[in-house]
Design a protein with these regions (language model features):
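Solvent-exposed beta-hairpin/edge-strand motifs
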Residues: 452-467
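C-terminal beta-strand-rich structural cap/linker in extracellular carbohydrate-active enzymes
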Residues: 473-494
């Protein structure tokens, strides 16, 4: 049983005005008691108040499965091999990069070769493996295509990507009602006719099987992406396809049945809900109400858009899963700042992203977390005039991805000033190391008194002057300071 102890300083100090040392001793006794109960305790000391955070190693939440990013829509634009290799290193190398685990490869809908395309941005017109043989009039597979994107995938795997997820934003344009992969001619109408469901299933699985045969670590396919959005009509900014909740289930059930027949060595991921909030719970409920999907799928994937810093919604999502689907997992498969307003080079952007990651891990119990785009203005870095510019979001992401590894468990944190402090924290452990990520959103520095039994400590800092720099490595010590508006990762070893 866990016991909270709160120290109300005004009351205590009024009784022992002449005994500051006595107060210090009382606090130390309390901290020692908490430690014997399985807590590690952090005190955030601000003028006239004490914030006590207990990290309880005995209360575990989700087992983490990995961090990642997506290949869309930048990987096909990287023509220079040296640049591609540098990007792969920065993203996936454990020693000198982020050490990401997951690479999301986009199976494009073929708008690059579609003469009827209405997508204006050429970078959002994808090249497909599924091409028309003009001599026979039939579609065939050509896996030499999408060469730049495939090279980026090769390098990501070479540098350490352990999982590849193949995802579609739309079926191939030749299978759609409108003849375009950018959605239907009217809003909120599915662009995939029922008579083409089976063809779409075969198309995705054929491509996935080819990647598996080539030795890629394909762990999942994700054939549907953000089904609830209107996709089509007058707005055709990218590839996409609307599905109602019932249509989503019908398509994914066919995938599950065919994958069972083929004994596919990868999972079915879906439906990549474009927003996780109560008005779209119908998609979750109907997904798991399907006997086929409930048996075949252990995870529901969604995107963390449009609910940034909405703690109520994220808590509700986490509670819903814990209460209604206790045997299922939630993965956060896509996020970027929408709309992009914050200067990507400023600490503000790093703090913003770090807070979103912590919210999704703590409140929604996400078992994995993946950013939408790695190389773009709203991504982790950007290629400008041939030079890679590393954004502050990259360093914020590093505070999580380089230290919280697959297999680690998120552990409980007890906070005496929950809801009142601007210091956000999350904690993970593998039993030997405990990783604390501390985000100080305050305009002032925060003194920490870290009470625990550890042999060594490493600390990494991002603020106005540091970019996830190691600022300490050595014997464990109790007191340190979180600089104003900063992200600190503390690695504690028993």
């Amino acid at each position: 049983m866990l016991t909270r102890i709160f120290i109300r300083d005004k009351l205590v100090l009024s009784k022992i005005r002449k005994g500051k040392e006595m107060l210090k001793n009382i606090i130390c006794i309390i901290l020692a008691w908490l430690q014997t109960a399985g807590f590690s305790v952090l005190n955030y000391l601000k003028p006239n108040e004490t914030q006590t955070i207990g990290v309880n190693k005995f209360v575990e939440h989700q087992i983490f499965e990995g961090f990642g990013t997506s290949s869309a829509w930048w990987s096909q634009t990287i023509d220079n091999e040296e640049t591609a290799r540098e990007i792969a290193r920065l993203l996936y190398d454990d020693e000198t990069g982020l050490g990401l685990d997951i690479y999301r490869y986009n199976i494009g809908g073929g708008e690059k070769e579609n003469p009827a395309t209405r997508i204006g941005d050429v970078n959002r017109r994808t090249e497909s493996f599924y091409v028309l043989n003009e001599k026979t009039g039939k579609y065939e597979y050509d896996f030499t295509r999408d060469a730049n994107a495939r090279r980026m995938l090769d390098m990501a795997v070479e540098y350490g990507a352990k999982e590849v997820i193949l995802f579609c934003n739309s079926p191939h344009f030749s299978m759609t009602e409108s003849g375009q992969a950018s959605g239907g001619l009217t809003e909120y109408a599915s662009n995939l006719p029922k008579e083409n469901y089976a063809a779409f299933v075969d198309y995705v699985l054929t491509i996935a099987d080819w990647f598996v045969e080539q030795g890629y670590p394909v762990t999942a396919i994700s054939p549907i992406n953000e089904p609830q959005w209107k996709w089509g009509g007058d707005w055709v900014g990218q590839e996409g396809c609307h599905y109602s909740a019932d249509e989503t289930v019908a398509v994914l059930e066919l995938f599950a049945l065919e994958m069972q027949k083929r004994n596919s060595p990868y999972k079915l991921s879906g439906p990549e809900s474009g927003q996780l909030s109560p008005e779209y719970y119908e998609y979750i409920d109907k997904f798991f109400a399907s006997d086929i999907l409930n048996e075949f799928c252990d995870t529901y994937s969604g995107h963390s858009y449009w609910i940034d810093n909405n703690l109520w919604v994220k808590t509700d999502v986490g509670n819903k899963f814990a209460e209604q689907y206790p045997e299922k997992k939630l993965e956060m498969s896509e996020w970027c700042e929408l709309p992009l307003k914050i200067d990507s080079t400023a600490i503000d952007s790093g703090l913003y992203m770090a807070n979103i990651i912590a919210q999704d891990l703590n409140l929604m119990n996400a078992v994995s977390w993946q950013s939408w785009t790695a190389v773009n203005g709203d991504g982790l870095m950007e290629l400008i005039n041939g030079e890679l510019v590393i954004y502050n979001r990259y360093y914020a992401y590093k505070h999580f991805a380089s230290f919280i590894k697959p297999g680690m468990a998120r552990i409980d944190i007890m906070d005496s000033l929950k809801g009142e402090s601007k210091v956000v924290s999350t904690a993970f452990t593998d039993g030997k190391e405990t990783v604390l990520v501390l985000i100080n959103n305050e305009e002032t520095s925060q003194l920490i008194d870290l009470y625990g039994s550890y042999s060594s400590t490493e600390m990494y800092l991002t603020d106005e002057m540091n970019n996830c720099n190691k600022i300490y490595s050595g014997n464990f010590f109790r007191e340190t300071t979180l600089p104003a508006r900063s992200i600190t990762t503390i690695v504690l070893t028993k």
